[in-house]
């Protein structure tokens, strides 16, 4: 629960069946549909759209190199085509994108959807899966900008091989510039993303079709799944290893689901079916037609698709596409972080709005600078896209596998599918995802360790924060005085002064620490005392008409509950202003806010390992204050400190 006494956001309440929660689904006119599809092409498909820069090349030059001959060329392009068809089209577009949480997608949204009403044991395992998928996403958010920009800038070596040493520093300059402009927002230039990516995908399609026609029209036969099956049947071990590079063709598939709340399922599907999938297919086929005619083009088949005089413009266009793909991942990291803060897995962080008119345009400084630092580390460590490709696939395939696991729970518990319906379909997805993941496990020594390390570090921090908050809330419930007892005893004899005091409290049935400290030290109570609890629900948005509910207790005490969805930013003064308009009792110019700031003290009875307790204490100290997080007027806030000792059941 996001409040003064709890360092994170509120415990999630299940209100999905209440019509007051959530927002209507997406419905669009034809004009709006085209605009949203163009926007989706610019944001959602940036990552998967830059895959042709490196995916096919890595199949032949990567971890397990393959001979450049027609057998492998036809087999691999057939495998890439059917991977895109099965993973992106069937799994994500036709199936997973139907699993929206009031229009929102992504791991956190799916997690909040499937744990509703689940028994505690199942919930714990689901939370572990969902949080680990989120942790892997942060590793992917570090690798994608480095991989995309390095691959684009490596086009310089096609023009002049001696430019090879310039690729890392040029990539660093481009990415530092990208991270530095985040604070200003990208709304103005963001309008150009769709048109630029549309030109980029058109270029992919034209170059691919040109090479198919002029080099080897027979490559179209590779659309027959026979070639993919024959490739595997001839050498199953070699086929298994190849999956580790083939999966690079679908990096970014998770973005279709994660960004569904911004554009809607229909515009994303339209963009995939009519623009992105055909363009990618033609480009991969074109690269393979080129390789079939000229095996030496494997050095960089993407750029060799273009005639000499078009390579510089293609490098510029590909670099723009790589920057847009990187921007989409950075924005996604901000969005996922905001959701995790609201759902109580990450401490309160400073969140800045970069647009007064567009919802969701946010900037989180701490996340931005950590991502930038880690991207620079990656470029310094791996130096080129071939080396970095070894680190890329494992985070992507791990997230895909976990999403399939959670979907299995969804179709059984939420959609109530019969076993004969759900088991074959989910097993099919798990088989595909599992094969891709295991193939990438072989890359762990060459770079796959990096996203796993990042994932485990982030997972540990998220679970430590969640566990620490739970223990803190448990301890505060143990020592809290019932509000009715407080009103009848201490409050009845206190001196009352004019005005309104609002005390933020994590629970809606106890006396907040700040109220007890205020009465103990100041010996007074205000004429009106409001106990305010901010609750984050398990839906993306809460209907503003049901935002706040106030009930009278007795003797000038009131209970106020303000609700937000996990995609919303709490703005307490704005919510109180709505109440003020409905009656004269609450006037902001006559109101003071009292909040409590906890300090964790060492405990010999803690149920957390000592290193986790110290980690939680550090995160607690560095979390943003409730004043900033809830947008309280700083000149009307009184902050009172308190100490707390974690206790709880045994366990680590």
Swiss-Prot record:
Q: What is this protein called?
A: Probable potassium transport system protein Kup
The reply to whether Cell membrane figures as a keyword in the UniProt entry is yes
Gene expressing this chain: kup
Q: Where are the transmembrane segments?
A: 36-56, 76-96, 125-145, 161-181, 193-213, 228-248, 270-290, 314-334, 362-382, 391-411, 419-439, 444-464
Q: Where is the composition biased (Low complexity)?
A: 1-20
The record's catalysed reaction(s) read: K(+)(in) + H(+)(in) = K(+)(out) + H(+)(out)
Give the originating organism. Zymomonas mobilis subsp. mobilis (strain ATCC 31821 / ZM4 / CP4)
Q: What is the annotated localization of this protein?
A: Cell inner membrane
Q: How does it sit in the membrane?
A: Multi-pass membrane protein
């Amino acid at each position: 629960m996001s409040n003064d006494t709890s360092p994170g956001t509120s415990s999630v309440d299940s209100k999905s069946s209440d019509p007051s929660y959530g927002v209507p689904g997406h419905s669009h006119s034809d004009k709006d549909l085209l605009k949203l599809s163009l926007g989706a092409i610019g944001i959602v498909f940036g990552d998967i759209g830059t895959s042709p820069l490196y995916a096919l090349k890595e199949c032949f030059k990567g971890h397990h190199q393959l001979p450049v001959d027609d057998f492998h060329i036809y087999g691999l392009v057939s495998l890439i085509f059917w991977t895109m068809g099965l993973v992106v089209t069937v799994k994500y577009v036709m199936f997973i994108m139907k699993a929206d949480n009031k229009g929102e997608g992504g791991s956190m949204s799916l997690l909040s959807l499937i744990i509703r009403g689940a028994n505690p044991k199942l919930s714990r395992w689901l939370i572990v899966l969902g949080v680990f998928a989120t942790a892997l996403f942060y590793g992917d958010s570090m690798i994608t900008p480095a991989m995309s920009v390095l691959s684009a800038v490596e086009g310089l070596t096609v023009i002049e091989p001696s430019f090879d040493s310039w690729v890392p520093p040029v990539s660093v300059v481009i990415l530092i510039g990208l991270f530095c402009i985040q604070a200003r927002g990208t709304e103005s230039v963001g309008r150009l993303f769709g048109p630029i990516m549309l030109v980029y995908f058109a270029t992919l399609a034209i170059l691919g079709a040109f090479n198919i026609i002029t080099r080897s029209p027979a490559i179209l036969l590779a659309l027959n799944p026979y070639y993919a099956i024959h490739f595997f049947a001839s050498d199953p071990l070699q086929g298994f290893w190849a999956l580790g590079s083939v999966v690079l063709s679908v990096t970014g598939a998770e973005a279709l689901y994660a960004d569904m709340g911004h554009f809607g399922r229909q515009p994303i599907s339209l963009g995939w079916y009519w623009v992105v999938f055909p363009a990618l297919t033609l480009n991969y086929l074109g690269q393979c037609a080129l390789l079939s005619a000229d095996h030496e083009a494997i050095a960089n088949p993407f750029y060799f698709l273009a005639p000499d005089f078009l390579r510089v413009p293609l490098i510029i266009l590909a670099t723009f596409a790589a920057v847009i793909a990187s921007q989409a991942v950075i924005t996604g990291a901000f969005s996922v972080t905001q959701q995790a803060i609201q759902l109580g897995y990450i401490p309160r962080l400073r969140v800045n709005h970069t647009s007064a008119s567009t919802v969701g345009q946010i900037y989180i400084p701490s996340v931005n600078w950590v991502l930038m630092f880690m991207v620079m580390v990656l470029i310094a460590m791996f130096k080129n896209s071939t080396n970095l490709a070894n680190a890329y696939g494992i985070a992507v395939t791990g997230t895909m596998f976990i999403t399939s696991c959670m979907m299995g729970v969804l179709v059984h518990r939420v959609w109530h599918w019969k076993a004969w319906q759900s088991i074959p379909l989910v097993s099919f997805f798990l088989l595909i995802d599992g094969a891709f993941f295991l193939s990438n496990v072989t890359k762990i020594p060459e770079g796959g360790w990096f996203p796993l390390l990042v994932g485990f570090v982030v997972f540990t921090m998220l679970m430590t924060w969640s566990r620490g908050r739970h223990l803190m809330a448990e301890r505060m419930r143990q020592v809290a005085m019932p509000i009715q007892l407080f009103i009848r005893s201490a409050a009845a004899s206190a001196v009352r002064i004019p005005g309104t005091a609002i005390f933020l409290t994590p629970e809606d049935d106890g006396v907040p620490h700040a109220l007890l400290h205020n009465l103990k030290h100041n010996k007074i109570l205000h004429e009106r005392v409001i106990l305010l609890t901010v609750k984050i629900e398990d839906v993306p948005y809460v209907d503003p008409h049901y935002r706040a509910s106030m009930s009278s207790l007795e003797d000038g005490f009131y209970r106020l509950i303000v609700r937000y969805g996990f995609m919303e930013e709490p703005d307490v003064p704005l919510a109180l202003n709505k109440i003020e308009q409905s009656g004269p009792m609450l006037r902001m110019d006559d109101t003071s806010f009292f909040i409590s700031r906890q300090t964790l003290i060492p405990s010999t009875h803690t149920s957390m390992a000592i290193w986790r307790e110290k980690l939680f204490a550090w995160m607690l100290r560095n979390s943003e204050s409730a004043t900033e997080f809830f947008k309280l007027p700083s000149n009307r806030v009184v902050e009172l400190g308190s100490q707390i000792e974690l206790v709880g059941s045994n366990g680590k």
